[in-house]
Each structure stands twice: as C-alpha cells, then as structure tokens.
Amino acid sequence: MDVVVAREATTQAQDKGADSSLRPGGVLRQMLLSDNAPDGLSFKFFRSRYQPGEKAFTSPRHHHAFQQLRWTESGQINYGPGQYISAREMAYFPRAAYYGPQVKDTGVGLLLQLGFHGEHQYGGVWAGVRDEAIKRLKETGTFADGVYADTDPDTGERRERDSGQALYEEQYAALTGKRFVVPHEGYDAPILLHPQAFEYYQAAPGLEIKNLGCFFDHPGPNADIRLSVVRLSPGAAYHFGLDRAQIAWTTDAGLRIEDRTYPELTYLYSPRGEKAEISAGSTAEVFVVEFPRLD
C-alpha cells in the first residue's frame, strides 16, 4: 500500500505557459499517487489549489477517452458554465462525456484520472515520447489558451482541437502506429454527487458504509468504477480486497494503517492483488474508489 500525507507532499506551481503551453493557469499542484499497473490500468491522483485572476486555470469545452473523478476539499470548483462542485461534494466525469468551458479560479480539490491501454497517458512509456510529440505538434501548428490549431492534412482546412487531445493523438500514433479515437459517450455529461445526502448502513460493528454509485464505461461484470464512503469508529477495521485496485482519502485525523496513526488529509493506494486494512483511533470518514477491472 502507498500512503501520502498532504503536508509532506511536494507542491509545484504550474505557472502560465508551463506544462509545455498546453494549459494556461497557475495551479498549485501536489501529485499524490499514480500507477501504470500490469492489467493496463493507468491513473494519476493529485491535489490542486486554484488561483484567481491571470493565474486561473481555463480550458475549452472538450472530452477525453479516460474517466475522471473530482472532489472538492474547500471552496467550490467550476467545471462548466454555471456548474460547480461544492466542498465535500464530487463529480464523476464519464469516458467521452463533454464538459466545459471551465474556469478554475478558486477552491482546493482532488482530481483522479484513469484509463486502460492508452486511454490515459501518464508516466511510463508515455513520458518518453511526450517532449518529441509536443515538438512535432509545434512544428505544424500552435498552442494557445488550451487549444491546438493546425491544418487538417485531409481537407487542407484549419482545424482546432483541445490541446490535451492533440497531444494524446500524437503520442498514441508514435507508440502504436494507430489512430487515437475517443469513443461515443455512454453518459451525456458529468454526474454531480452530493455524498451528504446518502445514508450510511451498518456493515459490521463500528463500520458504516455509504454506496454512492457504480458507473460502467467499459463492458464486463467488473468493469464499473465504484464510489463509496466508509465511516470507522475506534476498534473497527475496513479491508481492501484483492480483486480490485483502490484509492481512498480522509480529511479526518486518526486513520491507522499498520502501526502508524495518520493526520488529516491522508491518501492511500491499494494495488490489485494486495491486501490492506485501515482502522481509526477516533471516528474517521474515508472516501473510497474501487477501480474497474476489464478481465
């Protein structure tokens, strides 16, 4: 199990023009957890503090081949015109669902991105082709305000794409020789969840669970992403199973893992195939995400 505490994680400023000019903004970001697993799962999980004015993070209306989950720690975070995720609420962004344009200029939140077999491209082999892919794109077009503009080789006409999407297409072609395609959306739009409106049920003495939702973006009996909240009383334990990779986080102090008691804002990753257990020295509420399985 990997465990990260917010106050111990490095903060990096993504100043305007950074990230190879793909996204404007001045986000203060902490990379918390990530993996490229043997079963094809790729994810990254990070904490961001958004800033006002010229340092606001902006992006055009767009979509992705990967799935996302966003949770707001404090304030409220925008994801489209008139659309906000308030504190301690979350939104699930299904694969291929359009959202935005967004202006993130306030709030602190968590963002999880995940996909399989090139849907999500982070670290590993993708890191090795990123710089060259951006160089090629800049030779044939321009990045500005989160948009990549170039000339369509088939029609000869000017075209505009989300800058992140353009990079994914270029990287995927470089590694596989194939065209990167975002599938048709199965869900029409992001799904805003209000966890406080769900009720707990008692799963065991001292262990309560809220099931928030299961969402299928892939075929298969275990291909759903599962969202829940666990509440632990002193002396109770919650077990992460072997069959799925999972991440979890808590804003409460007192979470116990093995012989250590952790402070508030603790995050953990339990890879598929590993057993893990958490308990609490005092009552703790833990948000849990169970990753899909495609086999």
Kindly label every feature range from the protein language model.
Residues 1-71, 76-295:
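Jelly-roll (double-stranded beta-helix
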